[in-house]
Amino acid sequence: MCVRSCFQSPRLQWVWRTAFLKHTQRRHQGSHRWTHLGGSTYRAVIFDMGGVLIPSPGRVAAEWEVQNRIPSGTILKALMEGGENGPWMRFMRAEITAEGFLREFGRLCSEMLKTSVPVDSFFSLLTSERVAKQFPVMTEAITQIRAKGLQTAVLSNNFYLPNQKSFLPLDRKQFDVIVESCMEGICKPDPRIYKLCLEQLGLQPSESIFLDDLGTNLKEAARLGIHTIKVNDPETAVKELEALLGFTLRVGVPNTRPVKKTMEIPKDSLQKYLKDLLGIQTTGPLELLQFDHGQSNPTYYIRLANRDLVLRKKPPGTLLPSAHAIEREFRIMKALANAGVPVPNVLDLCEDSSVIGTPFYVMEYCPGLIYKDPSLPGLEPSHRRAIYTAMNTVLCKIHSVDLQAVGLEDYGKQGDYIPRQVRTWVKQYRASETSTIPAMERLIEWLPLHLPRQQRTTVVHGDFRLDNLVFHPEEPEVLAVLDWELSTLGDPLADVAYSCLAHYLPSSFPVLRGINDCDLTQLGIPAAEEYFRMYCLQMGLPPTENWNFYMAFSFFRVAAILQGVYKRSLTGQASSTYAEQTGKLTEFVSNLAWDFAVKEGFRVFKEMPFTNPLTRSYHTWARPQSQWCPTGSRSYSSVPEASPAHTSRGGLVISPESLSPPVRELYHRLKHFMEQRVYPAEPELQSHQASAARWSPSPLIEDLKEKAKAEGLWNLFLPLEADPEKKYGAGLTNVEYAHLCELMGTSLYAPEVCNCSAPDTGNMELLVRYGTEAQKARWLIPLLEGKARSCFAMTEPQVASSDATNIEASIREEDSFYVINGHKWWITGILDPRCQLCVFMGKTDPHAPRHRQQSVLLVPMDTPGIKIIRPLTVYGLEDAPGGHGEVRFEHVRVPKENMVLGPGRGFEIAQGRLGPGRIHHCMRLIGFSERALALMKARVKSRLAFGKPLVEQGTVLADIAQSRVEIEQARLLVLRAAHLMDLAGNKAAALDIAMIKMVAPSMASRVIDRAIQAFGAAGLSSDYPLAQFFTWARALRFADGPDEVHRATVAKLELKHRI
């Protein structure tokens, strides 16, 4: 249980077998045959405890983190903290008590996560009887070793419990010698502790074998002359130990255990039934064991009169309709055996519940290997690949069965398999639901709307995965496919996706171990995409495009199954030891399913038949052809290559209906989303902003974000010229996005719902344009995924911040850091609990030219020295949860690699960030204005004043007309600016950008003011969005530069170009 080796690892990777980290390369274990090594001189076997005899702390930590929603790796990182002098190592040398360890350990974890971590709960789980049980395969091996006259020992890095007894949940009678670090004051890999163990055994190093799960401990033992075995999983380690000792250590049936008391069946009546079935006259005893796998239908091993059998039965109690259909299992296996599909030989189906309590069937036992760990520890990479190839091949064989030839044409309904399955699993889930799981609710709504258009019909297994296959002990050959309970006729791609579940689950997932955190290339295991291509090649099919849908559906099924197991565990019906854990796992798996639904939404959008952006007539700038610039190409630089006098071959797109078909379809999809999702949610969102919980993100907003992702309405803002490969965004031009931005602007909440809100949009564009790959990986990706938020710190209270060169905050170089000092205010979004990044602008060289004095740094919000002085209000509005803060930066130390683009480039970065952002602001303002005018028109039609409707009043009519004219004027001007940016770049559009920034906010203020006037006092209330519209329209008259600055810019450019 030592973590010492981790301190010496160059990448600080833990090698505990079931941690959430990559597997290391396993040694070659050779053949599975037992070979007697004649002349063996081994006289003792020495065992580590954690990871060898009982589950390792890493495995327990990973399980506990999942169940308690603690970020994976937290416990291991805290255990590693401090190296030899850290609390964990001192605890194992008995230098501190359990109480002292938990106090220091808890402090470390809490500092990492900035919140309290219940480490007592982890320690209780680690030392509990439920977890700290000796592996049966090791118990059996120790028994056989001692029966042969060899000594056994435990050599463990261990600790004292609060009762002052060492943690040793083992039968001490199994061992001749026990050496524990807490009793000796030294830990592995200190050579003294190995020598002490050998001295107590009275042996030389070469006469012993040492088993440990940590490479560093084994290395020191090997240096002393002890033979070592690396334990990646107990069963594989026992096989290697058998080869070294030359005799068998396992005499039982693999993967079985004594029958649980709640799963016992009457032996007498079963024995009578089997004697009649098999014609057996013997009076010998019936041996009955229970298989570890098969949590849905209890499965038993039976030995009677030299016959090895397997019995599968329905679980007891009231069951969901159509579930646990063992009758169908019997029928399908009997039919497929005649079609060359490897299945066990079934003998009889007994539907008489009086025999053992529920219906069951009996089949012959098929000896072989069942690989419960999909990483296949102990095998060569080539053998692992061969195993997965064989798995793929047998799946193709199942899907190629002639239904009519084997009499299975009525085994299920033909066609519409996925729709029926969705309905079935929704029904099953609802029947076993114990609480509301948001991701499941979203999937229940999403799946029926995204069904595959074309489906083939074959036999489908329904639960096809590696641990439902029996393999030949020595060859990569499938001997039998098990667990046919969910089989039917349906879409074969559902089987293919289901067989890839492990590729997306962590290795420590309690119910189905995964390989998501393994290096598949190193292991030799095909990635999910390669596995799917392999299947398509064998079946002669083109690859499907909607792979993500099938994965979403598969994980949705798993979540529904886990929920059913959990519900049955509450009544004692489920047979698996994992059943009670599945309550929390259902939510984990449903979130995975939703992730695939989101990916499918992105795929649908990105694979729309967009016209090549380089040849769109409405934004491609046709330049004179030259040898350096082929016809139709375009530079993505913001520097114009010719005069804006050159016009494009297409016109300005002034209406959404004139957009290209795919973008027009996107616009209408967004409009439908706004009408169906966003507008109806506004009252609840407004109530949240006024509630005591307003400084926490609204759960409804988060739910709407997930729905927007799934609909492909996410990250639409990045302009094509900044992201020409569409790597990060939708690849829209400024004009295309302007129309969508206006639509989002009709609601205060829509930009955030679609991840298109400031200041994140500007910061993400900054990172795309100027960030290093490391900066993008650290900050851009979480922002794009909506997992983090950010702020931009430029405005200062002591200077006119409209002139960026006035910035006084200092950035001083010190060793490998920059030290920041400064006073900022009106920092939008800094109060948001999700804000993880502050993009900070400060002065690095006050003696440089004015436009080269400023620099931009990426500052993590958890950096010491950032002090929020107070929140600021706008006309009394707090704008929670993001808010606007006044902040001091006092001696804030930031690594040099957090500098953006380089020292002295801050002004350039700020200007580059503002160009598209001003288009966004202005189009949102036009959205404000359109919504305000629509509300005004509806209001004046329904109100009477002085005996006639308001709509008939002359002044009201004049206001409506004036508002319409001003909106249209502003829209045309903004679209023209966006069009020019698409054609010639930001610099060439500087005049137009300045004009729209001085026009749009003033226009919006006037239009909204007229609407408020028409509403009267109601217009000032939070019952309508008008008051907030007006607030932000007014604020934008100086945000991103005051109107006066833009008027001056326009005048200077006018004089420069026109005189």
UniProtKB/Swiss-Prot annotation:
- Chemical reaction(s) catalysed: a 2,3-saturated acyl-CoA + A = a 2,3-dehydroacyl-CoA + AH2
Give the CC-aspect GO terms.
cytoplasm; mitochondrial matrix; mitochondrion
Q: Which domain of life is it from?
A: Eukaryota
Residues annotated for FAD binding in this entry: 792-802, 828, 943, 1013, 1044
What residues bear N6-acetyllysine in this entry?
Answer: K427, K1052
In this chain, where does the modification N6-succinyllysine occur? K413, K427, K1052
Q: Which InterPro entries match?
A: ACAD10-like, ACAD10_11_N, Acyl-CoA_Oxase/DH_mid-dom, Acyl-CoA_Oxase/DH_mid-dom_sf, AcylCo_DH-like_C, AcylCo_DH/oxidase_C, AcylCoA_DH/ox_N, AcylCoA_DH/ox_N_sf
In Gene Ontology terms, what is a biological process of this protein? Answer: fatty acid beta-oxidation
According to the UniProt entry, the coiled-coil residues are none
Cite the Gene3D superfamilies for this sequence.
3.90.1200.10, Acyl-CoA dehydrogenase/oxidase, N-terminal domain, Butyryl-CoA Dehydrogenase, subunit A, domain 2, Butyryl-CoA Dehydrogenase, subunit A, domain 3, HAD superfamily/HAD-like, Phosphorylase Kinase, domain 1, Putative phosphatase, domain 2
Tissue specificity remark: Widely expressed with highest expression in fetal brain, followed by heart, muscle, kidney and adult brain. Expression levels varying from isoform to isoform.
- Cofactor(s) it depends on: FAD
The EC number on file is: 1.3.99.-
NCBIfam families given in the database record = HAD-1A3-hyp (TIGR02247), HAD-SF-IA-v3 (TIGR01509)
Family recorded in the similarity comment: Belongs to the acyl-CoA dehydrogenase family.
| Name of this protein | Acyl-CoA dehydrogenase family member 10
User: What species is given as this protein's source?
Assistant: Homo sapiens
Q: Gene symbol?
A: ACAD10
